[in-house]
Amino acid sequence: MQGFVDVHSHVVPSGDDGAATVDEGVELCRIAFEAGTRILFATPHAHADWDHFPRTAGRRDLYERAFPLVRDAVAAWGLDLRRGWEVYPSLVADGEDPRGYVLEGTRAVLVEFPGWWLDVDGAVGLVADAARNVERAGLVPILAHPERCPPVAADPASVRRLAEAGWPLCLNGPSLTGDHGETAERTAWRLLEDGVVSIVASDAHGFARPPRIDVAFAAVSAKIGRAAALPLFDGGAVPWAA
């Protein structure tokens, strides 16, 4: 195995709830590297204007200044740190150009599931609208942490149509190991057993939520076998750029 590919982390300062300093970002990357990750995407939140972390000019500037500092520091170890964003679905559902949010070196945009304030039809419908607009731009939506969306947790079968549309569902590794609570853990395993999951990522936010997908890899391997688990972690399901 060449190493893990982690498409979802908040390890570069951007003014969101992830790494606060370049030094913290470097140390988080060290944790990822020592745990076996070789390609790591730094994906700060890009929320709607009314939400916690809108992608303001100030936040973009902070991220663009911090990113090369972290990237260059970790490159010497052999860790490939890449740019990206975690996009709130209403941004691209409402027509914003998704090409500004692409995961570097891929044809993918990471779109997050919304929170508790929508019912299941509203949540899945909003994500589907965003995914269709990403697809119209010639890109592939990767749909982040459906298991942490309460309406989906109440009705896990609701996301099958998203997976059947060819849109990769991406679980948080910590959900599989119980670190996001019993409901997220139960839902994550249900989705995995239903065969609708394509990718597992860390969604790391700091030292309390580190970028270690090796722990989830061990748990999934114990459940379904290493050969079946590996494609969820090695980047095989990521739509890489030609």
Predicted feature residues:
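Mid-to-C-terminal alpha-helical segments outside catalytic/metal-binding sites
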Residues: 214-242
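His/Asp/Glu-enriched short active-site or ligand-binding loop at hydrolase and phosphoryl-transfer sites
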Residues: 166-178
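Hydrophobic faces of well-ordered beta-strands that scaffold small-molecule active sites
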Residues: 5-9, 40-42, 81-85, 109-111, ...
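Charged helix-capping and loop-helix junction motifs
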Residues: 21-24, 124-129, 154-161, 182-190, ...
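Extended substrate/RNA-proximal surfaces in nucleic-acid metabolism proteins
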Residues: 51-168
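Active-site mouth loops of central-metabolism enzymes
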Residues: 11-22, 112-121, 176
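Short acidic/histidine-rich active-site segments
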Residues: 45, 196-212
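An N-terminally biased module of ancient metal coordination in phosphate/nucleic-acid-related enzymes
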Residues: 1-76
